């Protein structure tokens, strides 16, 4: 049975901080959703096109490994992204966004209101933590559920827990975090997710996805 557009869940990745990991999280969670057998479609609203480029790499990889499931990532201008969502029927749409959200507050608001869950990735660094607090408050003011996701976490660095506590003063934080793993980067370089290669970080990504899926009422 084809997915019902009215039942499509929309997962938005949002952050005003460059390098926070929006595109990476989009790729990781979309591949986890596909592995779960969901009809997941990506929407790349970032002019850098990293998410869409990942799909192209995946298609090249599938030529030698056709057993790898197909992944579809559509492209839309940020100003048109909320309208583009209305044209997608799937189990899940994963949305990647640009950094300069302040350049188009109307589009930012429209995307937030159109989403079922907003994830705000953040590296465990003081500058990053400070920069993402405002967007969490914005999402909360608009009445949409939002969670921080700690990203590129080094296991032996104590700053991760202090960052978690600081973020928790503003909004909820996903219990699991994305580690700083070269195997995550290597998987994405081939258009894959680490859950598909079972590399270091696969269990962490699976845990983040499991929590997101629960919050989306898809579990």
Which residues does each PLM region occupy?
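Beta-strand-loop-alpha "switch" segments that mediate conformational coupling across diverse proteins
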Residues: 154-156, 164-195
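NTP-binding/hydrolysis catalytic cores, primarily Walker-type P-loop NTPases
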Residues: 193-219
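Structural beta-sheet core signal
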Residues: 42, 95, 120, 148-150
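Short, well-ordered alpha-helix to beta-strand connector turns
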Residues: 90, 115-116, 171
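Conserved C-terminal guanine-recognition region of P-loop GTPase G domains, centered on the G4
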Residues: 129-151
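P-loop/Walker-type NTP enzyme "switch/lid" segment
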Residues: 2-20, 27-105, 109-110, 188-189
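Inter-motif core of Ras-like GTPase G domains
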Residues: 104-125
């Amino acid at each position: 049975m084809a997915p019902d557009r009215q039942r499509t869940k929309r997962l938005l990745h949002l952050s005003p901080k460059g390098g926070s990991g929006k595109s990476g999280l989009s790729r990781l969670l979309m591949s986890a959703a596909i592995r779960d057998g969901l009809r997941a479609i990506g929407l790349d609203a970032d002019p850098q096109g990293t998410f869409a480029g990942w799909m192209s790499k995946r298609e090249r990889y599938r030529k030698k490994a056709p057993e790898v499931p197909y992944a579809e990532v559509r492209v839309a201008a940020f100003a048109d992204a909320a309208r583009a969502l209305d044209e997608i029927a799937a189990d899940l749409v994963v949305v990647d966004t640009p950094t300069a959200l302040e350049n188009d507050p109307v589009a930012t608001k429209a995307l937030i209101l159109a989403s079922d869950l907003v994830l705000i990735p953040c590296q465990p660094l003081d500058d990053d933590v400070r920069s993402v607090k405002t967007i969490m408050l914005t999402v909360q003011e608009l009445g949409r559920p939002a969670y921080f996701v700690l990203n590129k976490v080094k296991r032996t660095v104590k700053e991760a827990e202090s960052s978690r506590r600081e973020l928790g003063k503003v909004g909820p934080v996903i219990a699991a975090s994305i580690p700083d793993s070269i195997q995550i980067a290597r998987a994405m370089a081939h258009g894959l997710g680490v859950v598909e290669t079972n590399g270091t970080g696969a269990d962490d990504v699976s845990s983040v996805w499991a929590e997101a899926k629960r919050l989306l009422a898809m579990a």
